[in-house]
């Protein structure tokens, strides 16, 4: 998806992304200022980049594409907005292997700044229907030999996170205080502990925004 640590194309390969992701990169990165910004933030990565066009994927996939590299079927499927607006998964049916990307984290916390907490759960439910033995997450170790168990665990992570956030917000607990209310959460000690409060913050903001939006909708429906 669109993130500084997720794309480059100077290695000679044809780069594919969902069309939503490709268009986002094209819109935001097709300016020299982004190249200059990248060089300033990470000189080692940015030193070999000459033009913004080098950052844009070659091909955008609208919904679904099938490739057969080496004679093996590989399906690229756009899932919608879960972790980010451009979520794309790769499925190898013959191996029962699913590359889930950042739709799934395994045993570690992650940044959920662009996550649609309402949209990602139905997407995870769809992924649970994929016949697979191994799931490769966006972050964390592959979940091997247990089918979609890794997806189910991350789904529970998100559900329990949102349930507690809902309780805290409804009780009037501030976002900063909410970060102190998760020490007994069963996923609190996952890897990358420096990001647990980031995940809580993003979930808190998402819940508040959705609550306000639903309230706004209800007011307009009453007027109609």
Where are the predicted features?
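Histidine-centered divalent metal-coordination motifs
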Residues: 1, 83, 139
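Di-metal (Zn2+ and/or Mg2+/Mn2+) metal-binding site signature of metallo-dependent hydrolases
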Residues: 1-11, 86-89
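Short internal beta-strands
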Residues: 14-20
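Active-site metal-binding loops of divalent metal-dependent hydrolases
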Residues: 20, 102-103, 139-141
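Metallo-beta-lactamase
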Residues: 20-79, 85, 94, 124, ...
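Active-site-proximal loop/helix segments of hydrolase catalytic cores
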Residues: 73-131
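Divalent-metal (often Zn2+) His-rich catalytic cores of metallo-beta-lactamase-fold enzymes
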Residues: 97, 119-173, 177, 181
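C-terminal regulatory/interaction regions
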Residues: 170-224
């Amino acid at each position: 998806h669109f993130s500084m640590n997720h794309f480059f194309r100077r290695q000679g390969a044809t780069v594919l992304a969902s069309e939503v992701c490709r268009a986002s990169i094209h819109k935001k990165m097709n300016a020299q200022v982004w190249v200059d910004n990248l060089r300033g933030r990470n000189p080692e990565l940015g030193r070999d980049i000459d033009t913004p066009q080098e950052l844009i994927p070659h091909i955008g996939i609208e919904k679904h594409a099938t490739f057969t590299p080496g004679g093996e079927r590989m399906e690229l499927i756009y899932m919608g907005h879960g972790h980010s607006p451009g979520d794309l998964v790769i499925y190898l049916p013959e191996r029962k292997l699913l590359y889930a990307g950042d739709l799934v984290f395994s045993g570690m916390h992650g940044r959920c700044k662009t996550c649609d907490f309402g949209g990602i759960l139905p997407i995870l439910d769809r992924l649970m229907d994929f016949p697979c033995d191994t799931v490769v997450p966006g972050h964390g170790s592959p979940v091997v030999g247990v089918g979609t168990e890794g997806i189910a665990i991350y789904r529970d992570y998100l559900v329990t996170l949102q349930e507690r956030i809902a309780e805290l917000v409804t009780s009037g607990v501030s976002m900063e205080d909410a970060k102190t209310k998760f020490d007994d959460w069963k996923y609190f000690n996952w890897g990358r502990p420096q990001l647990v409060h980031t995940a809580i913050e993003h979930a808190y903001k998402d819940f508040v925004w959705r609550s306000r939006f639903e309230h706004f909708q209800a007011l307009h429906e009453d007027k109609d």
